[in-house]
Amino acid sequence: GSLDDFLNIITLSYDEFIAQSYFFKIYDKISNFIKYFHQINKIIQSKKNVSSHYDLNEDMYRLFLDKDMQYSCAYFHNQNISLDQAQHDKKKHIIQKLQINENMSVLDIGCGWGGMALQIAKDTGANVKGITLSENQFVTAQRRAQEEGLNEKVTFVLQDYRHETNIYDRIVSVGMFEHVGVN
């Protein structure tokens, strides 16, 4: 046989050994427990995680984000549109899907630099509360609401989503759930 045949036999034998080995079954259970433990995201840890990622110099983010500082989930409905247009289209698409109107209250969980919340208020007249754990994003979002004359319609709060107690007509969260963990 060839070297390739030998490596295939070794690989199959190793996989069989792993599947039947008591030691590796225990190892797998311990490994899964450790993975689960690392995914527990207590509020204090959430704040640290968000800060270490988003409380960096915003100039860095401006190098690769769209002009509205949208972080994820751009909607490229065709290949010929720019990142700015794709992010704008994403916000419009979400607002349309949620059927938001001016009589509604909306919660934006993980609001980032405020782009989604501000767009909702501009397009619909709804009252929007955006929450974030990032101090830099919070300051920028507040400044943007003031500059755009939307501070009567949009409120930004430095808060964990688990502390929110109000009732809303709609809740939106774009690209935040990867930070949630298991708790």
Where do the PLM segments sit?
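N-terminal auxiliary segments of SAM/dcSAM-dependent transferases
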Residues: 2-64
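A short acidic, Gly/Pro-enriched loop at the edge of an enzyme's catalytic core
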Residues: 162-171
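Conserved SAM-binding loop
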Residues: 141-142
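A conserved beta-strand element that flanks and buttresses the S-adenosyl-L-methionine
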Residues: 172-177
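Conserved SAM-binding loop of SAM-dependent methyltransferases across substrates and taxa
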Residues: 113-124
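Conserved SAM-binding strand-loop segment of SAM-dependent methyltransferases
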Residues: 148-161
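Conserved class I S-adenosyl-L-methionine
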Residues: 102-110
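Conserved SAM-binding motif I beta-strand of class I
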Residues: 127-132
